[in-house]
Amino acid sequence: MNKNNIVSAGLLIIGDEILSGRTVDQNINFLAKNLSENGILLREVRVVGDFENEIIFAVNELRKKFDYVFTSGGIGPTHDDITSLSIAKAFNQDLILNEVAHKILIQHYGAENINEARLKMAYLPRKASLLDNPISSAPGFRIENVFVMAGIPKIFQAMFEASKKELKIGCKISARELKISLTESVIAKDLTDLQSQYHEISMGSYPFENGTSLVFRGFDKEILEEAFLKMQNLITKIDPKIIIEIL
């Protein structure tokens, strides 16, 4: 597999509420699965608090490393919602009143109900393009390879669905799984030896109660099946009865 064909992404989760433990993130799993379905690998997830400099630093690092960056959180009306301003500064752009976003807010709340806090949500980086948000009025946006979205899972998911048409499709990854009633330590050496033969295949070992799940992932399905069969044969030689499930 040519590495130039691999499309990668990073996720930046923004919010003190995540770091304090008050809120449990529900967006990582959704994003990872949906990106994978489009042949895009989620390669890194970072969490930062509501600090402008930290957001700017993280966004600038991630957008240089990956094809796409998704952010969640911090685009609401309160004083600690500083994502839009931070993204603007990361791109050296002014934060301006986006007329389209402003009209959306007026349609949602009514012109007489647009106070300073709500108007704040219409201020976006100068070159931002809006992401559709059919759930609420808070606008998400895209600027270059960065997609800025809400932290609330239902809204995050809706914004992602709206952004999918703008993503390039990568080479989809295949996966196989072997569940066995052995501890990791028993098969660790065999797995290490096999991994050294197949550098293009990701081999993971994940313990559960009374067993281990071996997960093989790769872009080349033929090579993946070859490596997986070798592992299966190694386990069978130990004792075929220890195989719980093959997926």
What are these regions (language model features)?
Residues 2-45, 50, 225:
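Glycine-rich phosphate/diphosphate-binding loop of Rossmann-like nucleotide-binding domains
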Residues 181-185, 242-247:
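Short proline/glycine- and acidic-rich turn/helix-capping motifs at secondary-structure junctions
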Residues 29-82, 86-89:
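N-terminal small/polar loop signature for handling phosphorylated ligands or for N-terminal nucleophile
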Residues 145-236:
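An accessory alpha-helical subdomain
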Residues 14-16, 71-79, 150, 218-219:
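Glycine-rich beta-strand-to-loop/alpha-helix junction loops that act as flexible
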Residues 54-57, 64, 82-168:
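Proline/glycine-rich low-complexity loops and linkers
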